[in-house]
Amino acid sequence: MISATVAELSESMAREDYVLSDGLAVSLFLALRKQRPLFLEGEAGVGKTEVAKTLAKLLDRRLIRLQCYEGLDINAAAYEWNYARQMMQIQSAGQGQLGNDDLFTLENLIERPLLEALRDDKKGAPILLIDELDRADEAFEAYLLEILSDWQITIPEFGTVAATAPPIVIITSNRTREIHDALKRRCFYHWVDYPSVQNELDILRRKAPEAGAALCEQVVRFVHRLRDESLFKAPGVAETIDWAQALVELDCVAIDPASADSTMGVLLKYQDDIARISGSEAARILTEVQTELSGFKAG
């Protein structure tokens, strides 16, 4: 059941270990209440995809994921015909014995994620995750417009398949290119930023409960300072969690310069970034973090 208030939605998502920012909570709530797609844009690793996954668990709905990539077409995204089965039918019936109505049937139709999402089940309409739309070609966006506008797909040989109840749609983009305005207008939009220190601490305590409170504080504040550096790719929330878990595996109860340097590849994924931060720069950031935490304790 969809939450009655924004606060209730935030609390429900938190019980599933997803911490919503205030802005994202409002956007998600409105998208659910108004049955509009939610377009989430932001850096990789900030938790956009997890919104759909967590929502599926919360509402006990099927999650249908369409992972976008360059060259994605209708056959992979929406439907295709079972040509092998059609050929067998033709061979069995004899040449010229079957017409289009005999061959282009529901039984010969192979459903891909977009078409599958238009079919609900006993649990209700599914959640459709269109992940990393910016990786797909612009032509694919045009195809999505009919679905997002009318909740239907037109199949030339078969007819129009319409949803009895619209799916819950979450679209994500890492903004490697701009998505066309025509598609954005059909959605509610939210930019997913890196979480605040307190929100990221909350996330880390939920996702890495084995890490002690002091270690979590160090990890989060170190990562936040790292994001202020001129890096090719700043670490996301996923990297924060991975780093805390890695440090626990190494029996670290606190970060020191040696452990920071030896595990930098968990946080950063480009050699130029690692080379720039490792050593004196990591030690400087760590000193700033320790000074900040000492100030909190003194206060």
Q: Where are the regions a protein language model picked out?
A:
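C-terminal regulatory/interaction module of P-loop NTP-utilizing enzymes
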Residues: M1-G299
